Curated annotation (Swiss-Prot):
Keywords: Chloroplast, Membrane, Photosynthesis, Plastid, Thylakoid, Transmembrane, Transmembrane helix. The gene is ycf4. It is a multi-pass membrane protein. GO terms for biological process: photosynthesis. It comes from Tetradesmus obliquus. It comes from the Eukaryota. InterPro entries: PSI_Ycf4_assembly. This is Photosystem I assembly protein Ycf4.
Length: 205
């Protein structure tokens, strides 16, 4: 018999999903746009205030980009207060959110694998967590601890489809990823394969 008949390993993507890469990039670019707009409105307002209080504006030769900002403000650009200030505020929030999101992607929080090993008679559930004491979540159980495989399907706006590993002592361990639920067909297929592989009952379907 080949290795597949003794060992099954299911990989969990975690935070490194395409949708997370997409939204983290969009928010980062958008926040930069807000910040640049707010900063440019502040520079333009400062230049205008300086020009009004100084009689030597005509004798000054401003750098090209500063003069462009001044001219844009005089032709209908936003004022720093309150519009520009709000732009800076929302841009800063968006930037911090995108940095946090990129950190989650870099750490791959929630990613890992489930290994079912008949050859050595153990089940291993591995997940990456946040940096610190619980960075690695590595759980081991024996195959004898498994009583059944249970599938939970919650319909609605935030639909959830989860496979649970039911252990002795009424313990249940979720073994599917969070944030990107599998389709009903994928859940049924994976749960059935796992129940047949472990030779335990399947509940919830």
């Amino acid at each position: 018999m080949n290795q597949e008949n003794f060992i099954r390993r299911y990989f969990i993507i975690g935070e490194r999903r395409f949708s997370n890469y997409w939204w983290a990039t969009v928010i980062l670019i958008g926040s930069f746009g807000f910040l640049l707009t707010g900063i440019s409105s502040y520079i333009s307002t400062s230049l205008n205030s300086t020009a009004l209080s100084s009689n030597i504006e005509s004798q000054m030769q401003l750098p090209f980009f500063l003069s462009m900002l001044k001219n844009s403000n005089s032709t209908g650009a936003i004022n720093f207060f309150p519009q520009g200030l709000l732009m800076c505020f929302y841009g800063s929030l968006g930037f911090l959110l995108s940095i946090y999101w990129w950190c989650l992607i870099f750490w791959n929080v929630g990613g890992g694998f489930n290994e079912f090993n008949k050859k050595e008679n153990f089940i291993r559930i591995f997940r990456w967590g946040y940096p610190g004491k619980n960075r690695k979540i590595d759980l081991y159980y024996t195959l004898k601890d498994v009583e059944s495989i249970r599938v939970e399907i919650l319909q609605g706006f935030d639909s959830q489809r989860t496979i649970f590993l039911k252990l002795k002592g009424n313990r249940e361990i979720p073994i599917t990823g969070i944030g990107q639920p599998l389709t009903l067909q994928e859940i049924e297929k994976q749960a059935s394969e796992l129940a047949n592989f472990l030779q335990v009952s399947l509940e919830g379907l």
